[in-house]
Amino acid sequence: MAQKTFKVTADSGIHARPATVLVQTASKYDADVNLEYNGKTVNLKSIMGVMSLGIAKGAEITISASGADENDALNALEETMKSEGLGE
């Protein structure tokens, strides 16, 4: 399993549009991809799961991936977080 922690830098946190971008990126991979925030873990391929967390600016989130293409998935999600201005 591979994982990485990010600090959310987007002023609006992770709301509908950025959540959709993350879900679309995660869904391109076969690996199981999860997002953990505030003690709760959700499937990052589920828009409802991600939205239910209410992730605000300044939050620390951990994205983990497990499976054959886990490193590719995690690298793509890291790039998405940075390119979309969501986190670092």
UniProtKB/Swiss-Prot annotation:
<dbReference type="InterPro" id="IPR002114">
    <property type="entry name" value="PTS_HPr_Ser_P_site"/>
</dbReference>
<keyword id="KW-0813">Transport</keyword>
<feature type="active site" description="Pros-phosphohistidine intermediate; alternate">
    <location>
        <position position="15"/>
    </location>
</feature>
<keyword id="KW-0598">Phosphotransferase system</keyword>
<dbReference type="GO" id="GO:0043610">
    <property type="term" value="P:regulation of carbohydrate utilization"/>
</dbReference>
<comment type="function">
    <text>General (non sugar-specific) component of the phosphoenolpyruvate-dependent sugar phosphotransferase system (sugar PTS). This major carbohydrate active-transport system catalyzes the phosphorylation of incoming sugar substrates concomitantly with their translocation across the cell membrane. The phosphoryl group from phosphoenolpyruvate (PEP) is transferred to the phosphoryl carrier protein HPr by enzyme I. Phospho-HPr then transfers it to the PTS EIIA domain.</text>
</comment>
<dbReference type="InterPro" id="IPR035895">
    <property type="entry name" value="HPr-like_sf"/>
</dbReference>
<keyword id="KW-0804">Transcription</keyword>
<dbReference type="Pfam" id="PF00381">
    <property type="entry name" value="PTS-HPr"/>
</dbReference>
<keyword id="KW-0762">Sugar transport</keyword>
<feature type="modified residue" description="Phosphoserine">
    <location>
        <position position="12"/>
    </location>
</feature>
<dbReference type="InterPro" id="IPR001020">
    <property type="entry name" value="PTS_HPr_His_P_site"/>
</dbReference>
<keyword id="KW-0963">Cytoplasm</keyword>
<comment type="function">
    <text>P-Ser-HPr interacts with the catabolite control protein A (CcpA), forming a complex that binds to DNA at the catabolite response elements cre, operator sites preceding a large number of catabolite-regulated genes. Thus, P-Ser-HPr is a corepressor in carbon catabolite repression (CCR), a mechanism that allows bacteria to coordinate and optimize the utilization of available carbon sources. P-Ser-HPr also plays a role in inducer exclusion, in which it probably interacts with several non-PTS permeases and inhibits their transport activity.</text>
</comment>
<feature type="modified residue" description="Phosphoserine; by HPrK/P">
    <location>
        <position position="46"/>
    </location>
</feature>
<comment type="similarity">
    <text>Belongs to the HPr family.</text>
</comment>
<dbReference type="GO" id="GO:0009401">
    <property type="term" value="P:phosphoenolpyruvate-dependent sugar phosphotransferase system"/>
</dbReference>
<protein>
    <recommendedName>
        <fullName>Phosphocarrier protein HPr</fullName>
    </recommendedName>
</protein>
<keyword id="KW-0597">Phosphoprotein</keyword>
<feature type="domain" description="HPr">
    <location>
        <begin position="2"/>
        <end position="88"/>
    </location>
</feature>
<dbReference type="InterPro" id="IPR000032">
    <property type="entry name" value="HPr-like"/>
</dbReference>
<dbReference type="InterPro" id="IPR050399">
    <property type="entry name" value="HPr"/>
</dbReference>
<dbReference type="GO" id="GO:0005737">
    <property type="term" value="C:cytoplasm"/>
</dbReference>
<feature type="modified residue" description="Tele-phosphohistidine; alternate">
    <location>
        <position position="15"/>
    </location>
</feature>
<keyword id="KW-0805">Transcription regulation</keyword>
